[in-house]
Amino acid sequence: VLPGDTKPFHHYEDEIKHLGIDWMSGAKTELQKEVDSWTHSKKKLAGLLLDQSKISGIGVAWGSEILHHAGLRPDLKTCDQDLSGLVDSMIHIREKVKKEYSKQFNLSIKNDELVSFINKWFDNLYAIRTMEVYKKGSKKEVLGRTWWLS
């Protein structure tokens, strides 16, 4: 699939229409405009950041990195936090992700393991993971980070 080529995804046209700004390619001004609209929201920041209809492409892992880099808490209401550095953190993490994937891609070509790399990358993206169920308000520690579940 080439960037911008949605033909293989024609089954998902209705879902694609409802996606927000693409985090990986969205302009800083677009991202800033969206984040500015959250300023008075009483929703938790993590919920807005992971809402694919607002900004698409940010999952739990990248969302965690973005919030950590910005020094923001996912469990607090958006209106109770200073979001001034959020977009810069989004762009910083985005560039870091692109750089790492490019590096891994180039290494795989040099080592003649392109097929293996693509298969591992695809499996990581779509791997079926077991999920634990936690009660609302419970706390989960993962790799030194605390997650408050709502």
Predicted regions and their residues:
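Phosphate/anion-contacting hairpin/loop surfaces
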Residues: 1-72, 80-88, 143, 149
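Charge-dense polyanion-binding interfaces
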Residues: 77-100
